[in-house]
């Protein structure tokens, strides 16, 4: 059993979580809060008194531990409350109020005695993990280039014969650490001024798309030149899909946590794509899947995504 000490809103949030998860085994016996009258109840749990009365209230109640929960604006009181709790001799915990700031599972580390809370856990920040993934990208891209070279040569010939212009279309995208790079694709549209293409997505029955281009976009064959982006180190086999700078600037203001996707290399395929979020689909849902991938990366997850891509990721129903 425990006693919650702190501010009303944080205490209510903690009570709601404990009551919603009985498997945790916690039983809250009471609340100490300076801003709520003694005897007030919240979901059957009473306010026992003020925080200053902790040493008086504790002997009257059998408690295994005390949990301190304060709003960010009240952290100046933390030292005082910890001192009172320590005098009680009861095991004390601190529940930081950072849910609005840190929306996902954080992790802590010790830097020469200085405790540091990392806002987001990114496995690929680990040097060993990053090297393993890069080795997998190099090997995979080389194999991919060799295996698909007959198909790529065929596409080059068809594009050249059916539409005037370059074979490869190079477009600026935003990648790792917000750095821009030129992403390669087989040209699937009529040649147009760069100023016209920067700020518009392709739409259904877009007249700019060539006949062979429509087929390539639908089957994702137009993405094959990105194997060279992977070999160069601009991209990875698996990761969040990169976007154009104009849209990145737009989405960073509209979608919370959008920019987190740039903490890893963008991918040829990704967790969002194999779950159906490709092309003209919800950006917010794509970001949810991208964040899951970033925070839960493993070699096994990459292999799973590559496997799923072969079975359901190539055909893009939302490609125009």
Question: PLM ranges: what are they?
Answer:
Residues 1, 7-106:
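A solvent-exposed beta-alpha-beta segment
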Residues 36-40, 96-101, 105-115, 169-208, ...:
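Short, glycine-rich, amphipathic interfacial segments at transmembrane boundaries or analogous
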Residues 202-265, 305-309, 313:
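A short, structured surface patch at a secondary-structure boundary
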Residues 16, 49, 53-56, 80-83, ...:
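Generic recognition of well-ordered alpha-helical segments
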Residues 129-192, 229, 299, 304-320:
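A hydrophobic, helix-centered structural microdomain
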Residues 46, 50, 104-143, 167-170, ...:
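Glycine-rich flexible loop motifs, especially short His-Gly-Gly/GGXG/HXGH segments used as catalytic or interaction
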């Amino acid at each position: 059993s425990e006693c919650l000490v702190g501010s009303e809103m944080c205490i209510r949030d903690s009570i709601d979580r404990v009551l919603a998860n009985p498997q945790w085994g916690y039983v809250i016996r009471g609340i100490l809060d300076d801003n709520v009258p003694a005897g007030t109840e919240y979901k059957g749990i009473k306010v026992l008194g003020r925080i200053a009365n902790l040493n008086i209230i504790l002997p009257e109640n059998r408690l295994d531990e005390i949990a301190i929960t304060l709003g960010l604006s009240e952290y100046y009181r933390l030292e005082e409350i910890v001192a009172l709790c320590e005098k009680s001799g009861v095991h004390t915990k601190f529940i930081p109020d950072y849910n609005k700031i840190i929306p996902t599972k954080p992790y802590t580390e010790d830097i020469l005695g200085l405790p540091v809370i990392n806002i987001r856990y990114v496995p690929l920040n680990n040097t060993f993990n990053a090297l393993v993934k890069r080795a997998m990208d190099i090997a995979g891209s080389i194999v991919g280039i060799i295996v698909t070279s007959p198909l790529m040569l065929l596409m080059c010939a068809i594009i050249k014969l059916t539409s005037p212009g370059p074979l490869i279309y190079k477009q600026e995208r935003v990648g790792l650490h917000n750095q821009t790079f030129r992403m390669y694709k087989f040209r699937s549209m009529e040649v147009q001024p760069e100023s016209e293409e920067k700020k518009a997505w392709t739409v259904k029955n877009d007249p700019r798309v060539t006949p062979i281009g429509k087929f390539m976009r639908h089957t994702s064959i137009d993405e094959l030149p990105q194997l060279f982006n992977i070999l160069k180190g601009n991209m990875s086999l698996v990761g969040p899909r990169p976007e154009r700078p104009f849209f990145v600037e737009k989405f960073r203001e509209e979608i919370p946590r959008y920019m987190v996707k740039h903490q890893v290399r963008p991918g040829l395929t990704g967790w969002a794509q194999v779950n159906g979020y490709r092309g003209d689909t919800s950006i917010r849902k794509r970001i949810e899947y991208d964040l899951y991938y970033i925070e839960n990366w493993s070699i096994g997850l990459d292999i799973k995504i590559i496997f799923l891509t072969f079975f359901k990721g190539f055909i893009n129903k939302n490609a125009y």
